[in-house]
Amino acid sequence: MEDINRLLQIRKTVLQMLSDREYIITAYEQEYPRESFVSRENLTMYCVKKDDPTDSIYVFFPDTPKVGVTQIKKYVDIMKDRQANRAIIVVQQNITPFAKQALAEFSQEKKITLEQFNEAELLVNITHHQLVPKHILLTKEEKLELLTRYKMKESQLPRIQTNDPVARYYGLSRGHVVKIVRPSETAGRYITYRLCV
């Protein structure tokens, strides 16, 4: 019973993450009935981006504690069928070393992005913590405007790592720029920008 509560909390965090990444969340996904939970595989979700219907994402919840290459291949096939270009795999423990290698290979070969999160990472939405400032992903146009306004090169911006927890939450990849808004006692708010590397 407690496991169901834990899974539904993780699912809630994933829905918030997808919403923050500007994916459309259906009413059914939001109001997922507790009674319809049978297995982790039932929690699988498919969403499309608000402004770009060709940009879609899958969220997989594997039943097995350790995820192997065969399961990764199965997920990639499912993605191909629906022409999804991104996926999040929420694992119970870890994925095998061969599966990690397969994730990297599929990402390079097939031009798809496979992200892996442990369940423990998604129990709490880190962006709701009071010490985590608001992060806003800039569009390409906003990024260009920022660089021209301050007459600077991309390499001169402060950096944020791709493996940073907030960068992973927002699905940032190399070259993305985020606007970070922090509260400030003197100025009201302090804005900074970071380049994902």
From Swiss-Prot:
Positions of transmembrane segments: none
Q: Which SUPFAM superfamilies match?
A: Eukaryotic RPB5 N-terminal domain, RPB5-like RNA polymerase subunit
Q: Which UniProt keywords apply?
A: DNA-directed RNA polymerase, Nucleus, Transcription
Q: Which residue windows are coiled coil?
A: none
Q: Which GO terms describe its molecular function?
A: DNA binding; DNA-directed RNA polymerase activity
UniProt record, GO biological process: transcription by RNA polymerase I; transcription by RNA polymerase II; transcription by RNA polymerase III; transcription elongation by RNA polymerase I; tRNA transcription by RNA polymerase III
Q: What does the UniProt record say this protein does?
A: DNA-dependent RNA polymerase catalyzes the transcription of DNA into RNA using the four ribonucleoside triphosphates as substrates. Common component of RNA polymerases I, II and III which synthesize ribosomal RNA precursors, mRNA precursors and many functional non-coding RNAs, and small RNAs, such as 5S rRNA and tRNAs, respectively. Pol II is the central component of the basal RNA polymerase II transcription machinery. Pols are composed of mobile elements that move relative to each other.
- Family label: Belongs to the archaeal Rpo5/eukaryotic RPB5 RNA polymerase subunit family.
Name the UniProt record assigns to this protein: DNA-directed RNA polymerases I, II, and III subunit rpabc1
